[in-house]
Amino acid sequence: MAKTYDYLFKLLLIGDSGVGKTCVLFRFSEDAFNSTFISTIGIDFKIRTIELDGKRIKLQIWDTAGQERFRTITTAYYRGAMGIMLVYDITNEKSFDNIRNWIRNIEEHASADVEKMILGNKCDVNDKRQVSKERGEKLALDYGIKFMETSAKANINVENAFFTLARDIKAKMDKKLEGNSPQGSSHGVKITVEQQKRTSFFRCSLL
């Protein structure tokens, strides 16, 4: 049976328990939101195929448990990941502080060239905010990675975050291929117009 995709990207969602990783995953994969998700036990994944630059890209997105007792399970899944989203809850200071710990785990266990992005989730709950957008932006700048604020509940920037990460992974792959090509021709990566319409980019921030 012929493959229905051109590329397969393995992505990870990591962060403390309760920051909304499962909700972000379901919003992107199912366009659904459920406020009664229990904490993920172990690891689960969802698949969604998107189109970038005329290529079909299958995203295999792993939802890893944030609790400390599952850390030994999740670290086995860092290897092979091409993109990692580090998620914190803007209403939970501790989850933001722990992003640095998660980054250390990535540096220890993941591929050196893995694409990373920080997501400040639950930006719809601004009246309970404990972490300013500027602090999220500065943290991302410190590590040289991208940042967005998202809301799985209000469907803000979730689509855009996954497309941005996938686009960066594909651009890096294309650059490597060009380096091995005698022509060295360039290939731009674009989000389709249809997908652009589905994003909610303007309501929260992107760095």
Swiss-Prot record:
One of its GO terms (molecular function) is GTP binding. Phosphorylation of Thr-72 in the switch II region by LRRK2 prevents the association of RAB regulatory proteins, including CHM and RAB GDP dissociation inhibitors GDI1 and GDI2. Phosphorylation by LRRK2 is required for localization to stressed lysosomes. The keyword Magnesium applies. Belongs to the small GTPase superfamily. Rab family. It catalyses: GTP + H2O = GDP + phosphate + H(+). It comes from the Eukaryota. It comes from Rattus norvegicus (Rat). It is an enzyme of class 3 (hydrolase). Its EC number is 3.6.5.2. Its main location: membrane. This is Ras-related protein Rab-8A. Regulated by guanine nucleotide exchange factors (GEFs) such as RAB3IP/Rabin8 and RPGR which promote the exchange of bound GDP for free GTP, GTPase activating proteins (GAPs) which increase the GTP hydrolysis activity, and GDP dissociation inhibitors (GDIs) which inhibit the dissociation of the nucleotide from the GTPase. Activated in response to insulin. Pfam families: Ras. Keywords: Autophagy, Cell membrane, Cell projection, Cilium, Cilium biogenesis/degradation, Cytoplasm, Cytoplasmic vesicle, Cytoskeleton, Endosome, Golgi apparatus, GTP-binding, Hydrolase, Lipoprotein, Lysosome, Magnesium, Membrane, Metal-binding, Methylation, Nucleotide-binding, Phosphoprotein, Prenylation, Protein transport, Transport. A motif (Switch 1) lies at residues 31-45. Mg(2+) binds at T22, T40, D63. PROSITE patterns: RAB. GO terms for biological process: autophagy; axonogenesis; cellular response to insulin stimulus; cilium assembly; endocytic recycling; exocytosis; glucose homeostasis; Golgi organization. Its cofactor is Mg(2+). Residues 205-207 form a propeptide. The modification Phosphothreonine is found at T72. Signal peptide: none annotated.
